[in-house]
């Protein structure tokens, strides 16, 4: 193969540098900002040692996980207090009881239009209860998670970053659905109980697409999640940890709290703060009332 002359190589380098500079200029100064009409409200619901997040958009509702079976009464009362009747998308990140324990009650008490799952093989009673509830409510559109799939509730976009069906292993935590929610210029990330191995895969595949304003910390603030390489890619300024008071796992782990403090990331904890509500106006995310 004929080698390129130094002059040609220099021209190529100059072209690449100019292209990169123009791309940066467009992204940061010339591109029209994405504007939205209204706000979305993010409810990190205190379901004890479990997870449940409700996002209310002007055009509909997204629910991610449904806490434990023992907290389902509280979850339903919370949804009722907000006047929730319809859930447009219901994402079950993975079939552990602390994430899907109240899912069957949600399916039986509200109009759920779409449910997103991974079909990770599970023999738990909570998972069986979800399947039974779906059999009774055949009108619900069941969606199997596919990496890169995008769904919308009005101007709010939900992007699934995995896993693909062929990537489900034997670990439910690391088969968690990863969801990025985008509203205007703002974005939020929800990773279920995904741990380091999944975070590394996300950075490898989506490094330039992971930047978010808000992150629900993975695995209840466990040190098995929120790796440095992942946090470097996501760079959130606001986070929430969903965990139970005096839980037996020691969540959130001290290493995680130290990491958040060193990075100057604002964080809230359901075990201490109870239900935590955030607002996203399409430009920034902030705790309601602040």
Task: Describe the residue ranges of each PLM region.
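Non-globular, low-confidence helical/coil segments that flank catalytic cores
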Residues: 2-290
């Amino acid at each position: 193969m004929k080698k390129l002359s130094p002059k040609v190589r220099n021209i190529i380098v100059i072209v690449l540098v100019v292209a990169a500079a123009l791309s940066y200029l467009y992204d940061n100064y010339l591109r029209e900002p994405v504007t939205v009409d209204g706000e979305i409200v993010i409810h990190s619901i205190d379901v004890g040692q479990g997870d449940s997040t409700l996002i209310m958009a002007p055009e509909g509702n997204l629910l991610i996980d449904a806490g434990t079976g023992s907290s389902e009464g509280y979850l339903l009362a919370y949804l009722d207090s907000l006047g929730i009747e319809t859930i447009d998308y219901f994402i079950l990140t993975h079939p552990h009881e602390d994430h899907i324990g109240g899912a069957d009650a949600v399916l039986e008490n509200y109009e759920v239009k779409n449910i997103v799952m991974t079909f990770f093989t599970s023999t738990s009673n909570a998972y069986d209860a979800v399947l039974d509830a779906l059999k009774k409510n055949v009108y619900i559109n069941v969606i199997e998670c596919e990496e890169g799939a995008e769904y919308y509730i009005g101007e709010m976009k939900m992007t699934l970053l995995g896993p693909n069906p062929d990537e489900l292993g034997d670990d439910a935590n690391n088969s968690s659905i990863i969801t990025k929610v985008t509203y205007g210029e703002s974005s939020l990330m929800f990773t279920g109980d995904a741990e380091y191995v999944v975070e590394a895969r996300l950075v490898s595949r989506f490094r330039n697409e992971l930047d978010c304003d808000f992150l629900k910390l993975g695995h209840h603030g466990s040190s098995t999640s929120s790796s440095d390489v992942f946090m470097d890619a996501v760079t959130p300024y606001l986070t929430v940890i969903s965990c139970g008071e005096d839980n037996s796992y020691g969540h959130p782990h001290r290493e995680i709290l130290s990491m958040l403090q060193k990075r100057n990331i604002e964080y809230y904890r359901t075990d201490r703060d109870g239900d935590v509500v955030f607002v996203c106006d399409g430009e920034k995310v902030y705790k309601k009332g602040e």
